[in-house]
Structures are given as structure tokens and as C-alpha cells.
Amino acid sequence: MRTTNYLLSTQKEAPSDAVIVSHQLMLRAGMIRKLASGLYTWLPTGLRVLRKVETIVREEMERAGGVEVLMPIVQPADLWLETGRWDQYGGELLRIKDRHTRDFVLGPTHEEVITELVRKEVNSYKQLPLNLFQIQTKFRDETRPRFGVMRAREFTMKDAYSFHMDQACLEKTYQKMFDAYCRIFDRLGLEYRPVIADTGSIGGSASHEFHVLAQSGEDAIVFSTESDYAANIEKAEALAPSTVLAAPTAEMGLLDTPNAKTIAELVSKHGIAIEKTVKTLFVKASDQIETELIALIIRGDHELNEIKAENLASVAAPLEFASESEIRALVNAGPGSLGPVSLPVPFIVDRSVAVMSDFSAGANIDNKHYCNINWGRDVELAQVEDLRNVVEGDPSPCGSGTLSMARGIEVGHIFQLGDTYTKAMNAGVLNQQGKNQILTMGCYGIGISRIVAAAIEQNNDKNGIIWNNTLAPFSVVIVPMNMHKSHRVAELAEKYYAELQAAGIEVLFDDRKERPGIMFADAELMGIPHTLVIGDRSLDNGVIEYKDRLSGVKQEVAIDEVINFIKAQLA
């Protein structure tokens, strides 16, 4: 490709609203342009990278037994009403009407559409298992689109859906897809981790996320220092603490704690060790219990894991904290003075709190706290659950090593959905006994456009993007110095351009009438892995200059060896 026939569109500076590196560099390198909030046009350079990601994903999906389809982005509301997600999905679901005032949605995902297809087209167990995938545009009406294509409203995604007669068959396909995802990210050259995950609004049972490691990642991921255990912060667990309780050392006492509204104030003003404190949080209860509120009790230095909490049967989902007026209607105290002793509502205790002794908590009287509380003696221990976020250094739940934490960008997510959608939509086939059987389902997503941004977050320097040979928009850039004044420079540049193209190598020929410094800066900004510099001075010595983008190393290559040399670099 000649730059004079190409939409290069590089920029010296990024807009002020581009915060993270990938957003800045994608704009500066001429990969994307913002059309509106969360909406981007992919320019030629960006599209070339996007297509390379798509190709690898498509190849590995087909290798794993996937069959490609293409479904409409506009979906009838009837399907979403059938599964109940019309009301459940929330503001991210963009609802539209056609000229006949019929309701539709702009698809954020395609579980309903694929299930509708399968229930019409598949009628026998002999047609299963079946794994269908597509690479398609999605739309989610994000509250705050940000970080460029990392969290855009419109994005490109590969989503796959598998259908099975039973759980055992689903688990086999799930493992195939897990392995396929690992191959995809290996081929893309990304540093990543698969982690155990929560199923979220998609539903189902087992789930894994795939995270590209990057400091700018929005997600906290947790992994063992000595085993393969890894999970996102929502799902991560620490090894359950010993259930042996230390014997009480003192009687429970009542403390005056004026102006101690927080754990930090209680610790600083009254000299209580933070690990000997607990905090009591009131949330809305589910309809499975008789009271409107339920209390969650965690250690003072721990954070509530809201996903773990709302997954409990007695807690309303989504999680909703009680207001002070709602709390005072049940307890003669407000937040900051609450605790388990004589609490008039049911409560759930975190595992770490269940093994505490001689601890302090609110007395359910304003400006009062109890000290030296002990389970069994002062208050009966009720339901015990894992309620907290893990912290660095917690023992790994596998019993091997401790937990470490890193930031990650979620680029893939796979689910064992079970019959969440097939049961709601009555999607079944005739089994071997000739009876209708509801299908079991899996779901597997990869953020194609997000992968591009994540790769840049992992591979950049002060000069721009550093693409590997797999993802680079062009493998080689030819920079001819003053070619418009030097016939032999122009002639050799044309020769290399033709020969590299004939060899199937993607090459950018910078034939602009620009200063060499601008041409070099653009090549580095775009992240092209291999640069060939042709100039009169080097030609006098029978060589050209080669520069490797990753290492920055320059070397001279004999004129007649250039093509073979480049082939070797790409091998």
C-alpha cells in the first residue's frame, strides 16, 4: 500500500478526553475516529488490525467445531419478553419502535435470537451437539462510555452458542471452547489469565473470564502464587478460616463512642484494633424471608463483596442498601452504631467474623458500642457465608500459596448456561425415547474490538504502538529518503515494494513528499514491526538500514539480501 493512496490520518497529539494509552494511540495512529459518545469509525489502519483479530478468532472457532452464522442486530421485543430480559436488562438495552409501533431492541447479545433459530431448525437429538457462532456488531447503551473502544456503546464481538442434550455434553464443548480461547490469545501474543467468574445478567452456572493483564484494566483479578487458581474479584475466595474459636478473655462491656460513625473513627479515637471490629450493613431482603431488611456482618477492615451478597437466597437482587430511615424504623440506632447483639432482624455473618472472639461492634444504640463480644456467650451465631472481597496475601482456597492481585481487561467470557434460555423459550428436541427434552446451552463471547485496545495497552512505548508480526496493520514499512530527488532510491524502493508484495508480505510504501523525521515518527507511532530505510549514503556502501520496532536495534543489510532477511524476520 502506498501512503499517497492511503488514509494515514496520524496526529501529533491526542484529544484531552483520551485518558488511557490505547485510546490516545488509536486516535494518534489513525486507527479510529469518534463520531459520537461511544461510537467510533474504524479507519483503514485500525480496520486492518481488527480483521486480523477476527481471522484468528474465526480459525480457532472452526477448529473447535464452531459453525458460523450471522444474525440481525435488530431483534423483536417479543423474544426478550419471552425470556423476561425485556424488564431485567435495564438501561443498557436500547429499545426502538418501527413505523408500525412494534417494539424492537438493538442487540447487546443474541441468546434469544439463537435459541429462536435452534427451536425452529433443530428437532432431533441426532442434530446435536451444535455450536453456532457469529462475528457481529453489538450495541449496549452504556451510562458512561469511556476509554475509546475499550468501553464503547457499539462494538464488534464474536459470540457463540452451543446446544446439548445433557450437562456432560455441554462440559465437553465448554472445555473445547476454553482451550480454543487459550489458543486465540496465545496466537495473538497477549499476556492473559483465565479466571473463575460470576455469570452476571447472562445467567447460568459455571463461567470463566479471560483477562489481558494491564495496569489500566478496570477489573481486579486474583490468582494463587503457587497454583493455577485464578478468579475475578467478584468470585474470588480465600481459604476458609479455622472454625476453632479462641476462649473469651473478658466480659462484654458497653462503651460510649460519641462521633464514632465509622470504623476508622472507632479505631483512632478508642484504640481498638481494626481486626477486632465488625461492621453491620443493612440491605433489602428477598421475598424468601418475612422481614424487609437483613443485616450482613463483615470484619471492620474488609469490604463487602456485593455480588456474593446478592447471590444469597435471602438477599434481594440487585443488592440495595437500606436507608437510615428504614434502619431506624427497626432499630433504635443509625449506621455506625449497629451490631449483632440483640439485633431484631436476621443477619448473615462472614466466615472471617464467625471465628472472631473479643470483638467490638455497634450496640444498636446511638453513640454506643459493645466490646469483648463473643459468639455463643453474648449472641448466637446464625448463618455463615463468604461475604467479603479477598485481599492480597490471603491463603489460596486451593490450599497452595497465597493470593496475589493484578489489574485486567476482560476480553472474553464463557458460560455454562444450562436451560436458562431454552426452558424460558421451550426450546427442545425429541430424545432417544421420542419425548421432548429441553436443551442445555453454553455461551461464549470475545470482544474483538476490545482485544485491539487491550493489545495496545500491553504493547507500547513513548513513541507509539509496538505491534507483533501477527497483529500489525503492515509487516514492513519502506522509508525512502528523498526519493523524489534520487532516482536510484526511488528505483530500489519500488523494487522492494513489488518483491515484498509478490511474496505476500503486507508492506506500506511511504512515498509522501515529507521530511524523513515525520516518516520515521509515523512508522513508530503506527507500530509497524520492521522498517527499511533507503538512502543515498547507505546505497554508496551497498546496504540499506533495517530497524526493529520492538528492540529499536538498527543494522545494515546488503541490498541483495533484503527480501530474504525480511522473510526470516517474519518466519
UniProtKB/Swiss-Prot annotation:
Recorded catalytic activity of this chain's protein: tRNA(Pro) + L-proline + ATP = L-prolyl-tRNA(Pro) + AMP + diphosphate
One Gene Ontology cellular component annotation held by this UniProt entry: cytosol
Record has DNA-binding as a keyword: no
Record Pfam families: HGTP_anticodon, tRNA-synt_2b, tRNA_edit
Domain of life of the source: Bacteria
Assembly, per entry: Homodimer.
Free-text comment about domains: Consists of three domains: the N-terminal catalytic domain, the editing domain and the C-terminal anticodon-binding domain.
Protein name (record): Proline--tRNA ligase
Lineage, broadest ranks: Bacteria, Pseudomonadati, Pseudomonadota, Gammaproteobacteria, Alteromonadales
